[in-house]
Amino acid sequence: MTDLPAQLERVHMVGIGGAGMSGIARILLARGGQVSGSDAKESRGVLALRARGAQVRIGHDAGALDLLPGGPTVVVTTHAAIPKDNPELVEAARRGIPVILRPAVLASLMQGHRTLLVSGTHGKTSTTSMLVVALQHCGFDPSFAVGGELNEAGTNAHHGSGDVFVAEADESDGSLLQYDPNVVVVTNVEADHLDYFGSPEAYIQVFDDFAARLSHGGLLVACLDDPGSAALAQRVAARGLPGVRVLGYGSAEDADGAFAPIDGVEVGARLLSFEARDVGGVLQFQLAGEQAPRTIRMNVPGRHMALNALAALLAAREAGADVDEILEGIAGFGGVHRRFQFTGREHGVRVFDDYAHHPTEVRAVLGAAADLVSQPHEADRRESEEPVRSGKVIVVFQPHLYSRTATFAEEFGHALDLADEVMVLDVYGAREEPLPGVSGALVALSVSKPVHYQPDLSQAPRQVAALASPGDVVITMGAGDVTMLGNQILDALRAAPHHHPSR
């Protein structure tokens, strides 16, 4: 039995192993659909889908459309990652099988639910995941589709029994305008994906258009620390959309007078302080209408994560969850795969991995790392006979996409200056062909801190191990295959003679 629309009963997905596509496949399977798909290579996501009954072929050919008895009722693909001459898309056109994009499927799956959607240039996955975990702790069983794997759930998607659906609303190709949300969270708005939008103005406009799709009685939750999302909140509040409320959150030096409206935007929560502790931190904040501040301990690092927690709190409260229980859930949130994820520790060197691939994300992660080096790991304190000094931040950065590297090379360089030592790898091109003169060296030229350009990925682990000392934090950073270097760096640290490089 299936409760799916007829078109989604037998679905073939091109690029099924990707973060967004695999999540949709999980939900389709859980709702009784038949799913087939193809991907360029084996992955954990592909193996997990096969275990749930999906028929997946590695490589792309027209015969993949025959994996399901009777063939697919629809073929699903992503906006840009799949070339139009893909043999499966060509065969679908020949057979007259409709080809639709992933967001159209997600919009269909969300019908009949109260939808809580998280958008913004950065922080979508972490905030969405925090919101899901908080609601689950409160006894909700929401459906969700997230761009990363929740550490608690070990999955990026779920078909829940409740009437709430939580999802990321990806703005990269404007497809978020297919959704009709009840609650929208906007973490920040900063020009990106200009290869698609063409101008910063067009990129910003898509958020205005998205907010305009809020249903009557809906809520826009926006970060007031970010100029882009604050301006969006002001525009929406001034426009007076029928039945739509606007609620801001952000930083304040103290609680006194912190809840006066800011440029017409009501303030719902204020971050009073964030103090780094080991691999997490202590967050003090105050909610509008409450007399006293609240304090919670978080298991994820960085002031940006503290702000994300306030966004998740306000959205979960709007869904009907109890504030105290929401905070318990947020306190237990263990993070998302590849979002400042702890890889391991060797000889007093802590290694983390992060997906950051935009200058603002790089700055946020390196700021959190700087807090960490002033807070040595408890194990280092126990193992050292002498006080453990604070260390340095070493970042191994892999630029993602030639177009983004060409646009932001100088900004990446300035952002990487927040580290003490920088290694820049070559560009991970993903779907793009190389651009003349664009490589990791372009980014390295804009770094003023000690920098190493290393185009040979295989040489990086040994080189990083030679740079690191006890107390240091190493971060592998980028949206490509740099993630595989973390464990290799730990292996290199184990193999290296115990040494203390000069600083």
Swiss-Prot record:
Keywords: ATP-binding, Cell cycle, Cell division, Cell shape, Cell wall biogenesis/degradation, Cytoplasm, Ligase, Nucleotide-binding, Peptidoglycan synthesis. Its EC number is 6.3.2.8. The lineage of its organism: Bacteria, Bacillati, Actinomycetota, Actinomycetes, Mycobacteriales. It is found in: Cytoplasm. It is an enzyme of class 6 (ligase). Cell wall formation. It catalyses: UDP-N-acetyl-alpha-D-muramate + L-alanine + ATP = UDP-N-acetyl-alpha-D-muramoyl-L-alanine + ADP + phosphate + H(+). It comes from Rhodococcus opacus (strain B4). It comes from the Bacteria. One of its GO terms (cellular component) is cytoplasm. GO terms for biological process: cell division; cell wall organization; peptidoglycan biosynthetic process; regulation of cell shape. The keyword Cell division applies. It holds the Pfam family Mur_ligase_C. Pathway: Cell wall biogenesis; peptidoglycan biosynthesis. Its main location: cytoplasm. ATP binds at G120, T121, H122, G123, K124, T125, S126. This is UDP-N-acetylmuramate--L-alanine ligase. InterPro entries: Mur-like_cat_sf (IPR036565), Mur_ligase_C (IPR004101), Mur_ligase_C_dom_sf (IPR036615), Mur_ligase_cen (IPR013221), Mur_ligase_N (IPR000713), MurCDEF_pg_biosynth (IPR050061), UDP-N-AcMur_Ala_ligase_MurC (IPR005758). Belongs to the MurCDEF family. One of its GO terms (molecular function) is UDP-N-acetylmuramate-L-alanine ligase activity.
